[in-house]
């Protein structure tokens, strides 16, 4: 899975979840490190996506 596919998958996972998802949980689902997910979330947010960070994880408001 390349970076663009991974970011799409992150968006889909967050949209489908009814609770916040941690970077660790997203990393396990995408087969990458937690730090890669943190970077991807930062890029998605910089691109205008409304992703909220909570103490329990990331969520789409």
PLM region spans:
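Key DNA-contact positions within bacterial/archaeal DNA-binding proteins
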Residues: 35
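Extreme N-terminal segment that seeds HTH/winged-HTH DNA-binding domains in transcriptional regulators
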Residues: 1-29
């Amino acid at each position: 899975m390349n970076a663009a596919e991974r970011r799409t998958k992150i968006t889909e996972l967050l949209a489908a979840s009814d609770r916040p998802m941690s970077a660790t949980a997203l990393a396990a689902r995408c087969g990458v490190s937690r730090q890669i997910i943190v970077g991807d979330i930062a890029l998605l947010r910089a691109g205008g996506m409304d992703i909220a960070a909570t103490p329990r994880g990331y969520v789409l408001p």
